[in-house]
Curated annotation (Swiss-Prot):
Source taxonomy: Bacteria, Pseudomonadati, Pseudomonadota, Gammaproteobacteria, Pseudomonadales
Family of this protein: Belongs to the bacterial ribosomal protein bL25 family. CTC subfamily.
Keyword Chaperone: no
Organism annotation: Pseudomonas fluorescens (strain SBW25)
UniProt function note: This is one of the proteins that binds to the 5S RNA in the ribosome where it forms part of the central protuberance.
Subunit structure: Part of the 50S ribosomal subunit; part of the 5S rRNA/L5/L18/L25 subcomplex. Contacts the 5S rRNA. Binds to the 5S rRNA independently of L5 and L18.
UniProt keyword annotations, A-Z: Ribonucleoprotein, Ribosomal protein, RNA-binding, rRNA-binding
InterPro entries: Rbsml_bL25/Gln-tRNA_synth_N, Ribosomal_bL25/Gln-tRNA_synth, Ribosomal_bL25_b-dom, Ribosomal_bL25_C, Ribosomal_bL25_long, Ribosomal_bL25_short, Ribosomal_L25_dom, Ribosomal_uL5_bac-type
Gene3D superfamilies xrefs: Ribosomal protein L25, beta domain, Ribosomal Protein L25, Chain P
Keyword ATP-binding annotated: no
HAMAP family in UniProt: Ribosomal_bL25, Ribosomal_bL25_CTC
Protein name as it appears in the record: Large ribosomal subunit protein bL25
GO terms for biological process, alphabetical: translation
GO cellular component terms, A-Z: cytosolic large ribosomal subunit
Amino acid sequence: MNDFTLNAQARTDLGKGASRRLRHAANIPAVVYGGNKPAESVTILSKEIAKLFENEAAYSHVIELNVDGTKQNVIVKAMQRHPSKQFIMHADFVRVVAGQKLTAIVPVHFVGEDAPVKKGGVVSHTATELEVTCLPKDLPEFIEVDLSAAEIGTIIHLSDLKAPKGVEFVALAHNDDKAVANVHAPRVVAEDEEGETAAE
């Protein structure tokens, strides 16, 4: 299991103007809340948080956040990126309390896609991440979806997945058995449509 750490500094200069000044200085604003403690506004070096989240696993791991020498365990709850440049503009972190269940977003990893593709199928991913609830010690790095037995017409729902021990899918708790992936036949263009296109 990887260890993830991040350094931050407390900030008191708040508001949109302050956030813009932070970004111009190569920092980003962030908020830490939860754990029955007051919310904290902090600032983090842009390059440091960018480097951390180059590793996909950081999104679903407990992170040791060091705020001016005070360490606390957190998970990322939300992240705002620039719409076109994709750099991180703001982050929300939730404190993790040992023995207390947390809710987190975990990436989905698809395996065995070659099997249905070799049979002429086209695989569509309808979910690339899933919301789970579990104790901090049980937080998975990812959820695996095995497509090796899938055929054309197969739809894999959340209820078809085997959750890791101690992990529950939030959507299922709300009776939302959503599709995660499906295999369908390739789209065939009618000959007359092809002819019309060629004529144009």
